[in-house]
């Protein structure tokens, strides 16, 4: 059994705020590490203290706006830690970039998610901890343990706390392939489930609603909010079908491009995301945006791994799939 004295936490530059919260929750100081980019675009890291014979946890979501740089920095950090004679390396990746590219949609396409998994594993990582991977098969892309934490319990608690007084609810899956995630929430809330089937005909995009939302509070459950265009279209259709209010809760908020403007101009009452991805000051000032802190869930998982305890759903405060 490992002790906290043999554990090191190292933060990449992708999300230092997340690493700080994790450090406080674990009561372990972040190890010194300098990361920089040369003018030619190359990445360099220097460890500021010994990690010899230590179990090292590298905290680095591979997220936007610099997803490729963040991936490269993670690989370089892992190589530096491995060459410094660490005992065990865990990559803590709250958001796994390229997760959408997990299968071939057309012929002659790559499966980039698998390529990223290969790179991470080959660099020397012994274990990966992530949250709400875009597809379950991503765990199978690795030949090392992958712990996929699930934010559903925190999302359910948020709904119960903030939307309890609003009346009858219906949970919405904004896509057919997200039904399983949405059903987990609807079962916990003991409410109906409806599905929005996204259809594209030429340049025109539309959604077909399967289910009844008339006179109900519609709660969209999704995985990633990127441009927010799908969420905005979903809210418009749900309101046109008689929904009294429309809220959206998603695991990861990339909020790319004009996402904030799209959100502000949409019929969504509120968009709730987690802090798996850092947000810009512009995003933080958006009145419709709310953020759930998931670092306590990661702290619990890390503590159980360090002490050799189970982190299955039956014995933990959170869900892992």
Curated annotation (Swiss-Prot):
Catalysed transformations (reactions): D-ribose 5-phosphate + ATP = 5-phospho-alpha-D-ribose 1-diphosphate + AMP + H(+)
Q: Which GO terms describe its biological process?
A: 5-phosphoribose 1-diphosphate biosynthetic process; purine nucleotide biosynthetic process
Essential cofactor(s)? Mg(2+)
Subcellular localization, as worded in the UniProt entry? Cytoplasm
Q: Where is this region: Binding of phosphoribosylpyrophosphate?
A: 214-229
- Metal-binding in keyword set: yes
Q: Does the keyword Heme apply?
A: no
One short Pfam family name for this protein?
Pribosyl_synth
InterPro entries per record = Pribosyltran_N (IPR029099), PRibTrfase_dom (IPR000836), PRTase-like (IPR029057), Rib-P_diPkinase (IPR005946)
Record's Gene3D superfamilies?
3.40.50.2020
Name the top EC class: transferase
Gene Ontology CC? cytoplasm; ribose phosphate diphosphokinase complex
Q: In which pathway does it act?
A: Metabolic intermediate biosynthesis; 5-phospho-alpha-D-ribose 1-diphosphate biosynthesis; 5-phospho-alpha-D-ribose 1-diphosphate from D-ribose 5-phosphate (route I): step 1/1
Q: Which UniProt keywords apply?
A: ATP-binding, Cytoplasm, Kinase, Magnesium, Metal-binding, Nucleotide biosynthesis, Nucleotide-binding, Transferase
Top-level taxon in the UniProt lineage: Eukaryota
Query: What Enzyme Commission number does this protein have?
Result: 2.7.6.1
> Which amino acid positions bind Mg(2+), per UniProt?
132, 147
GO MF entries? ATP binding; kinase activity; magnesium ion binding; ribose phosphate diphosphokinase activity
User: Which family is this sequence assigned to?
Assistant: Belongs to the ribose-phosphate pyrophosphokinase family.
Q: What is this protein called?
A: Ribose-phosphate pyrophosphokinase C
Q: Which organism is it from?
A: Dictyostelium discoideum (Social amoeba)
Q: Gene behind this chain?
A: prsC
